[in-house]
Every structure is written in C-alpha cells, then in structure tokens.
Amino acid sequence: MRIWFKKVPDGITSSVILSEDHLVDDLKDAIARKFPIRISQYYDAPELSIRVVAPPNASSELQSRELSPNESILFVMETYYPHGQDFNDALLVASPDTSVALRYRSSQLSSSTFESTPPVFSEYPPNIIPTPANETVPRIKQPSIALDSLESPVSAPSRHQSTYSYKGGPLNYNLRNASRTRSHQTLPSSNVNKTGVLLLPRSSRQQTLASRPSLPDLTSADKSQPSDEAESITRKNSIGMSTRSDESTAEKLAKAEVATPTNSRSISHSSLYTKQSGTAGVLPAVNADIDAANRMNPDISSQFPIADNKDPLNADTQAHLGFPSNQIDGIVGTSPVNVLTSPGIGAKAPFASLLEGVIPPINVLIVEDNIINQKILETFMKKRNISSEVAKDGLEALEKWKKKSFHLILMDIQLPTMSGIEVTQEIRRLERLNAIGVGAPKLTQPIPEKDQLNENKFQSPVIIVALTASSLMADRNEALAAGCNDFLTKPVSLVWLEKKITEWGCMQALIDWNGWCRFRGR
C-alpha cells in the first residue's frame, strides 16, 4: 500500500510503501528513512507530526486532524480516502519546529493549486529548513513572514507566490543564499585595515629591524631630512626586494653619506651571506639597502651588537668537534647555499644535500620478480647513494641474507619458489634460533650447522617491509603476523618511499649502532 505525504513547509511530496498492518508510528519511521539528512539528522521519528486533511467533498463528520501513533494506516486510508489516496491527497508531515495546529484553508484546495503551487497555511514559521552539517555559513536572523493577515481568498495566490521561490522552495532558503553571497563579498573588505604577518628570511628580518626610523632629534634640524629619506627607502624595500624608483640607489646612498656622517662601527649584515673574498652576495640589492639604512641609523650597532666572526671557533672547540682547521676556515664567510660546495664539505658523496649527515646510508635488499620494478627501485637507490642488491625469488633472497646482513628488505609477497611470507617466517626463525637482537634468549640446545649465522654480521633483526599489489586487510594481517615490520601497497610513491627509508634507516642505526658504524667504515 502506497502512502503519499507532503513535507511542510517546503512542500516536498513523496511516498512510502507500507503493509496493511502498519501503524502511524511505522509511517513516521519510513518517512525518517526517506529523508536521512533533512529529518533524521536533526529529529527522531517519533517527534514528527502527521496530519490528515479531509477531502473537499467529504462529509462534515470528517475533519482535518493529527494522527495518533497507535492508529492503523489502513483504517485512516479507508475512512478518509475510500476510493484510494492519490498525489493530491497527501498527508501533511511537520517537524517539531513547525506549529502542530496548522489550519488548512479548504478554499484554496483544488487540483490546479496542488499541481502548480504548494498549499497555504495560516501559520508559517520562517526558520524551518535545517542547515546541513557540512554547511559552514553562519546562521543569521531572518525576517519572519506573517501569513495570518489574509482577508480574502483572492489575495492568497499572490501572497503565496511571493512566499515560494521559482524552484518551489520557501523564501527563507533564498534569503540564506543571498546572505551567504553578501557575507562572502564583504569578507575581503573587513580585513583591509588589519595588519598581516609576513614571514621573511633572515636577511629581510635584519633589514626591517635595522631600517626602523629612529626618534627625531629636536636639537638638530639637519638630521630629520635623512631620517625621512631612510623611511621612504625602507618602505619601498620592506619585503626584502629592491624596487626601481625615479632616483637610483647610488644617488640615495651618496645623499645619505653627505647628510649623515658614516659610523665606523656599522653592522656588516652582508658578511653573513657573502664570502670574505669580496665576491657578490646572495642578495646584493638587499645588502645595499641594509648598508644604507645602517648609515642613516648609526645607533643600531649599539643596540644589536654582533660578535666579530674572524675567529668563530677556537682551537679547543675545533678539536672537540673533530673538524680540521682548514675546514673551519672554509666555512667562515661562506653563504649557506654554498656550504655543500665548500672545500671538504658535501663534495665527497653524490648524494649532496643537507641530509647527508642525518640519513644513515643503509644496505637494502630488493626482493622483486618483476624486472621493471627491479630497475625502478635500483635506480631509486643509486640516485640516493643507498647500497642495494636485487633478488629475483624468495630462495635467492634467503641465501643473500644469510651471506650478508642487510638493514632493510623490501619483500614482494608473490614470489616464485618461495613466497615472501615463507621467506619472512624463515628469517625470523633463524633470528630466534641464533638469538639475534637485544635481550634475545639463547637456546641451550646446539644449533644445526645449516642454521648457524655469523654473530659478527647479525647484531639486530632486519627490517622487512612487505610490498604487494593487494590491498586486502587479510593479506596485511598475514604479512604482519609472519614478521614483517611494515606493509606497503603498490604502486608506491617514490617520494613517500624515500621518507620511509629514512625512517627505517634511522631506526636501524639506533638499534644496531656498532654494526652501522662498521658499515660506514668508522
């Protein structure tokens, strides 16, 4: 049995299918399931109110009323609609925010009215439509629209058309959209006068600090003009870049030198980013503007003293850190960008980056039967100066691991002769048998000769990472239960793999520090 209902006040008409033994309470549950966002997200099903409307040609005994939860749907349909309920005889469903005592205007009820426009009620609460949970637009107070002031049925259609939009939705829904547009348009204007925060590099921060205009000296009128000129130069270059102007920077510097005597102890900010040999710095335009600001503000050197960098590290400090004296001399006065290219620093390895002294270079075993994947991983390791070997099947991987200890094994699960799960289980069995690892219990029984491992090569359990194209949780649990430390699903991002290798390498270096030092040749 199909039951038609109309959701008020938006006038959405829909239907549900119920059996003859269902009650009104079951109808409320079906309606709540029909509208999981607009009703179920905000109200419970028993909170809904269902109102039956008497047909225009019905007897005077039948009146519009609210249905009780324990009433039979079959009895209501046979009483009010003996010839069957159609689209125009829909029940009225209201939420708790809607007034229960909705007085239906029978004079407005007709087939054309129902097809063209939703019904008009005497009481129309304005804020009925709930806002979805993912809508972040703040709620505003909307103007209420009174519909009880209708005096004649003739004015009802015009008033009703002004209430509903062209899409059939209520007016307050359009008001919300309009307010959202207005609020979005007014957002930029509200932040015009607010001061923003700009994160600048070190040179720009020092420039901004050094270029603050000092307090005007009332005893000397000649110093005010250079201060104003310095302020204008600073305003043009406050973001760390030199801009063009009608007057060149050299002319401004010349005027500044004539107007203000040069301080012999001015701060040499450019020495922090340039070489002492007199070569050009990283930002020559910025350094020139900083020097100009220093000449115009000689008191800054006393407020922010900078230590002389001729002797940054004494002999005791150099000996304690283990740096040769020639390397320290090469670092002094060198730009941070060119530190790796300085003599004795960063030029000894192809993987020349700031992470050279941080990432432990580990030895990786790649177990992969696909030739393309082998070449990709091999090239990836070579570019990052990571020592690696390749095994084509599980048996070859097990033999290579026995002969040479590895820090990390990238294990493919689907392998010929021996699967990755079987190889992992065998490796963990041999590690337990030979008591590899900190705190591993040693067996009292003698170890078979084929299962014995070199104690000098194996100091800690190897990190095994499973690689597979399957994303099933069962495969992941099986790999972790076999002894894998991590589980990666193909295709793997090389950028993310590099981060994980860094993590695993640092972890292995901490676990087996002595073995890693031997691997480094220390």
From Swiss-Prot:
Where does it mainly reside? cytoplasm
Please provide, alphabetically and separated by semicolons, the GO molecular function terms listed in this UniProt record: phosphorelay response regulator activity; protein kinase activator activity
Cellular component terms per the entry's GO annotation: cell division site; cytoplasm; Mcs4 RR-MAPKKK complex
Gene3D superfamilies assigned to the protein according to its UniProt record, in alphabetical order: 3.40.50.2300
Residues crossing the lipid bilayer are none
Disordered: annotated span: 148-274
Superkingdom classification of source: Eukaryota
Cited InterPro entries: CheY-like_superfamily (IPR011006), Sig_transdc_resp-reg_receiver (IPR001789)
Q: Name one GO biological process term.
A: phosphorelay signal transduction system
> Where in the numbering of this chain does the Response regulatory domain appear?
363-505
Instruction: Indicate, by first and last residue, each region the UniProt record lists as having compositional bias (Basic and acidic residues).
Output: 244-255
**Positions bearing 4-aspartylphosphate:** D412
Q: Where is the composition biased (Polar residues)?
A: 174-194, 260-274
Provide the alphabetized UniProt keywords.
Answer: Cytoplasm, Phosphoprotein, Two-component regulatory system
- List localization entries: Cytoplasm
The record's function comment reads: Response regulator that coordinately controls the stress activated wak1-wis1-sty1 MAP kinase pathway and fission yeast cell cycle.
Provide the protein name.
Response regulator mcs4
Name of the gene this protein is made from: mcs4
